UniProtKB/Swiss-Prot annotation:
Location, primary (coarse class): cytoplasm
Organism lineage: Bacteria, Pseudomonadati, Pseudomonadota, Betaproteobacteria, Burkholderiales
Keywords linked to the UniProt accession: Cytoplasm, Methyltransferase, rRNA processing, S-adenosyl-L-methionine, Transferase
Function: Specifically methylates the N7 position of guanine in position 527 of 16S rRNA.
Organism: Cupriavidus pinatubonensis (strain JMP 134 / LMG 1197)
Protein name: Ribosomal RNA small subunit methyltransferase G
Entry-linked PANTHER family: S-ADENOSYL-L-METHIONINE-DEPENDENT METHYLTRANSFERASES SUPERFAMILY PROTEIN
A GO cellular component annotation in the UniProt record: cytosol
């Protein structure tokens, strides 16, 4: 007989893997926030078929390739968002560009209630999902915006602008750089060391106004693949 195949989910085992991953990353979260992370993962699984949020379908891979992958960047994102170098209303504000299913924006907002996260995407059904998550998870520090980031205007600016699967570094800088506060940082999440992208950024003349502060290697629990954070700031 035909029919849809369903993957059995061992919630207890997934919770243990999430808790172990958080410990490995160095994120000490209270039980209620771990509950919320787990609830977000359940929403991602539930609505993926409707909203086409990710090509990854297996629950274990969603945990490693999406949730833990995003959580591995949270310490750096939160540190830069809270930086005393950033003044005014921008401090503590993060813009997640091309957020899709909410990564890394929602894991960041769940883990750090003092950080305000705006997630932007050009696909309306994805921002609808993000708005639904905000309501169901009770995240007053998260919001979603539908539309291209290059048309977004925000007078308060952002301490951190991040992207996980949005665009090349050159496009990331050109399209979202106008929203960065003085002394803020663009933080791009990449896989392998993005030397070719850095070279193209230099060839485009962007290094006259921007500098690469650091390319930081990340370790994602349970994921045997390279991950890097590219930290950019204005000169």
């Amino acid at each position: 007989m035909g029919g849809q195949r369903h993957t059995m989910i061992d919630d207890a085992a997934q919770r243990r893997r999430l808790e172990a991953g958080l410990a490995e990353i160095g994120l000490a979260l209270p039980p209620d926030r771990i509950d919320t992370l787990f609830a977000y993962l359940a929403l991602l699984r539930k609505w993926n078929g409707v909203y086409n949020l990710t090509a990854i379908r297996h629950p274990d891979e969603m945990l490693t390739h999406h949730l833990l992958d995003s959580l591995a960047a949270v310490p750096a994102l939160a540190e830069m968002a809270r930086s005393s170098e950033v003044g005014g209303a921008a401090r503590g504000r993060v813009l997640d560009v091309g957020s899709g299913g909410g990564m890394p924006g929602l894991p960041l907002a769940i883990s750090c209630p003092d950080v305000s996260v705006l997630m932007v995407d050009i696909v309306q059904k994805k921002t609808a999902f993000l708005t639904q998550c905000r309501a169901q998870l009770g995240l007053s520090n998260a919001a979603a915006h539908w539309g291209p980031v290059e048309r977004l205007e925000d007078p308060d600016k952002f301490a951190v602008i991040t992207s996980r699967a949005f665009a090349e570094l050159t496009d990331f800088v050109n399209l979202s750089g106008h929203l960065l506060a003085p002394h803020g940082r663009l933080i791009a999440m990449k896989g392998v060391y993005p030397q070719a992208e850095l070279d193209r950024m230099e060839a485009a003349g962007l290094m006259a106004a921007w500098q690469v502060e650091e390319v930081r290697r990340l370790t994602v629990p349970g994921l045997d693949a390279e991950r890097h954070l590219v930290l950019l700031s204005r000169k």
